[in-house]
Structures are given as C-alpha cells and as structure tokens.
Amino acid sequence: MVMTDPIADFLTRIRNANQAKHEVLEVPASNIKKGIAEILKREGFVKNVEIIEDDKQGVIRVFLKYGSNGEKVITNLKRVSKPGLRVYKKREDLPKVLNGLGIAILSTSEGLLTDKEARQKNVGGEVIAYVW
C-alpha cells in the first residue's frame, strides 16, 4: 500500500500508542520524522528518542511519557498542513496552541521549529502539526 502522508501516519501511531498506554513506539525513519520526534523530546512530550540505523531507512524508537498517576502527557496531536492542502503562516500570523500550553511544529527555512522558536528567529513557514 502506498502511503501518501507519512507525517500523518507518524502522528497517528503516536496518538494510538499513547491511547493504549504503550511505553515504546517504533516507526520507519525519515529526516522530518526525526525532527518532529526531537522537538517532542525537547518540549517534554516524550521521554526519549532513539534513532536505530540499519541497512535500509532506519527506525525511530519513541519512548512515551506519562504522569505519576498514569495520565497522558500528550493530550492530542493534529496534522495541519496536508499534501492536498498546504498551510503556510507568516511570522506575525503564527498560531498559539491552547494559548501557549501546546506547540505548533513548523517547517521553516531554519529547519523544523516550534512556534515559539520561529517567533524568536522571526521566520514563518509551513505548519506541520499541533501538539497539546
């Protein structure tokens, strides 16, 4: 089966593993998925991220994070810009997810950034996803 949107697939796998309270998730690697996983780690939404290199494309192992009572750290993930409808925002129009409680992940000329980092660097770009 041909996958038309690997980023949406990655976010859906994280959402499903999170709902099922799995500790670890493995997905096929790509540069943009690695970047998204690193942002989730840096922002505290996941415990750790490992990149496993093999002879093919590699695997990203994501260690999901839960609170002390088992509550989910990631409430939801939403794909914004899709292959059929790209969404671009200027620096002054960058969205705030839940008034700053969540993050927007953007693909910019500076690489993958959160909405806060993009504001600091004064760049806009394609809004990949919202995480809260």
Curated annotation (Swiss-Prot):
A GO CC annotation given for this chain: ribonucleoprotein complex
Biological processes per GO annotation: translation
Superkingdom of origin organism: Bacteria
Record has Heme as a keyword: no
An annotated Gene Ontology molecular function: rRNA binding
Keyword vocabulary terms for this entry: Ribonucleoprotein, Ribosomal protein, RNA-binding, rRNA-binding
UniProt record similarity statement: Belongs to the universal ribosomal protein uS8 family.
Assembly mode: Part of the 30S ribosomal subunit. Contacts proteins S5 and S12.
Role played: One of the primary rRNA binding proteins, it binds directly to 16S rRNA central domain where it helps coordinate assembly of the platform of the 30S subunit.
Protein name as annotated: Small ribosomal subunit protein uS8
